A protein has these predicted regions:
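Alpha-helical assembly-interface signal, strongest on the long, hydrophobic N-terminal helix that forms
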Residues: 1-83
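Short, conserved structural patches
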Residues: 3, 56-183
Length: 183
């Protein structure tokens, strides 16, 4: 009886059929997770680059058109028109523009206001100041987006709100040039 059990146990342990299934089952989730994270990093990089480029172009327009006082909505529209991949930009972009006093420095808030996607209600701006000639201004844009693949390792590692939106923040500083009244 014991000999029969030993023989069957040796045959079972020596059998190599199906031996490729175990490594495949163990490695597949890791490889798929890495592939999804790679796609997520690419999408995040493209979104960040587009937001930063559009913000820089908008700031350049502000600096060149010294006689124009742009409103919050005009700047938001200019930034959103300068991007092609920021889905729902008008709804999930929030701007903050504050004056920076170089002589009496006060740190701006460390984190800009972002759109609250939980309620999708309009909340007042923390700060949006037009500024005057020779004044240093800080313009921050916060764009909220949903992850390309919520199952990826990167999407799970990024901070997000209750609705699953993640923030991309772009910052630009500029000096209001005086109007070009007559050289």
């Amino acid at each position: 009886m014991i000999g029969c059990i030993k023989t069957r146990l040796r045959r079972f342990l020596g059998d190599e059929t199906g031996s490729a299934v175990l490594p495949f089952a163990l490695w597949t989730p890791l490889i798929v997770g890495i592939a999804l994270s790679t796609i997520e990093v690419g999408a995040l990089t493209i979104r960040t680059t587009q937001l930063e480029r559009s913000l820089d172009e908008t700031v350049r327009t502000i600096r060149l058109n010294t006689d124009v006082a742009y409103t919050h909505e005009q700047l938001k529209t200019m930034i959103c028109e300068g991007t092609s991949l920021l889905v729902g930009c008008e709804d999930t972009l929030r701007l903050e523009m504050v004056s920076l006093d170089m002589r009496d420095w006060v740190d701006p808030a460390s984190r800009p206001d972002c759109v609250d996607t939980t309620f999708q209600q309009v909340t007042p701006q923390r700060a949006f100041s037009q500024g005057i000639a020779h004044e240093m201004m800080l313009l921050r844009a916060c764009y909220m987006y949903t992850a390309f693949s919520p199952a990826s390792y990167l999407a799970n590692a990024l901070p997000s709100d209750d609705q699953g939106y993640t923030a991309i923040i772009a910052t630009a500083a500029f000096v209001h040039e005086p109007s070009s009244g007559g050289f």
